[in-house]
Amino acid sequence: MAMQAHYEAEATEEEHFGPQAISRLEQCGINANDVKKLEEAGFHTVEAVAYAPKKELLNIKGISEAKAEKILAEAAKLVPMGFTTATEFHQRRSEIIQISTGSKELDKLLQGGVETGSITEMFGEFRTGKTQLCHTLAVTCQLPIDRGGGEGKAMYIDTEGTFRPERLLAVAERYGLSGSDVLDNVAYARAFNTDHQTQLLYQASAMMAESRYALLIVDSATALYRTDYSGRGELSARQMHLARFLRMLLRLADEFGVAVVITNQVVAQVDGAAMFAADPKKPIGGNIIAHASTTRLYLRKGRGETRICKIYDSPCLPEAEAMFAINADGVGDAKD
């Protein structure tokens, strides 16, 4: 009896900390058919429903205004969404996991590594190490927490066809991990257009509700937007679509506590101001991507295989630089 009570207590504790399955709403008096409709529309957790605007629920066929209000009211009871003290928030922040980048210098710059529960954007020219960092993180996120990992699987959305499993095997060997296990723990998808890229996030949400993921990579988040939308005439449509995509990424980071890493390309400034700028290149996506990313890292080439990473924007990290190297076994420290 005592044992059963112990297991029940453990189960409620688990529900409290992790995302709650959408089926929980049935226990709160929501019709099973309505819960099924929510699931089909891409809502797999109570958190996803609670964070959604009412307008989004009304777009689901068969959900009336009265139903939407009832669903949101019940979801709000299960998900704490009100004010909290800064002390409590500070306590929650201390539980955030940092995933190692593979380079001690880079980890020191990021005060531990890539943060879970937020979006980290890496931008730079070609050959600056963006994709290599993504490959290394896809392996390190599987390590135990005491070794700088996130003890979870990785999800990789590739828009440019640059994903190479061989690189993961080389990094796995360096950390003494089984190559086949590492590859099994990486869910890979190739995105072919911007709508497909967004659609993949609905699938990602369903997979994250089923299994423990620590990292979601989108390499690159903006490449397809440059080809699917062209010219100034389509700029506002492009930015709206991009904003929606980034909002979904942020929601996944909030809902499942995963680290979201996106890469971005740069564009050369060709206006008059570029003559006076120290570096005439800037990340594409404008203010929309600048506001969505929590931490922005600017990567540039150094000598030989070395690369330099600069904190371009962060709410808590000071502006500084670190040097790292791209080795045969992934990202590591630069040799002096």
From Swiss-Prot:
Residues 45-74 form the HhH domain. ATP binds at G124, E125, F126, R127, T128, G129, K130, T131. InterPro entries: AAA+_ATPase, DNA_recomb/repair_Rad51, DNA_recomb/repair_Rad51_C, DNA_recomb/repair_RecA-like, DNA_repair_Rad51/TF_NusA_a-hlx, P-loop_NTPase, RecA_ATP-bd, RecA_monomer-monomer_interface. PROSITE patterns: RECA_2 (PS50162), RECA_3 (PS50163). Gene3D superfamilies: 5' to 3' exonuclease, C-terminal subdomain, P-loop containing nucleotide triphosphate hydrolases. It is found in: Nucleus; Cytoplasm; Chromosome. One of its GO terms (biological process) is double-strand break repair via homologous recombination. A motif (Nuclear export signal) lies at residues 242-257. Forms linear homooligomers, giving rise to a RAD51 nucleoprotein filament, which is essential for strand-pairing reactions during DNA recombination. This is DNA repair protein RAD51 homolog A.
